[in-house]
Amino acid sequence: IKELNAERVSKGEQPKLVKLAVLLPLACAIGTGSLITKEKEVLLEDNTLEAVFSLPGEIFYPGSSVCACCMLFTLGQPHLKPDGTTRSTFFGYCKDDGFVKKKNLGRVEQFAKDEKGNFTISKWKEIEAEWLDLFERKAVVDGKSAVEKVNADDEWLCEAYMKTDYTKLTADDFQRTLNNYLSYLVKEGNVYENNGGV
């Protein structure tokens, strides 16, 4: 697109901006090693990182268990503005999309029920509308989104920048976290059951 825009400008035309969405493993967004940082630098020279969306943990279930994110770029527009300041990037935490895993079926869309027990609107449609609204407004909502000025040396994930909304945590959340941690310790062989218990 860089060459195309140079040609357009030489003809007195406006440069063309193209949007590109790409799905990548989280490691590409987290990575700050020399190889990934260099690739990020090259990307940002002529392109703007508009947004990064952290996707559900098992979005490709049952085919793959890789954790992924979606990066949205504007090609042909450097991430640095002409005045040398960095453009802002929207980060969306899109982990809960309203789908559930079902054995032999994969991820299945869920529907809300009305007071009569009839299925109504798709939970996904409600969640999608909220996510699109947050992105379009570049709104910052604790636990859901963040807006930051990042460069090649930074992490490109919402989790690094968003604030947690602790008002929504419950005793069940705490217990579930403790149970998960204990099962991890047992699995790794760090906790043994003895005569008196664990």
Show the residue positions of the predicted features.
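A conserved structural/catalytic subdomain of Rossmann-like adenosyl-cofactor enzymes
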Residues: 1-198
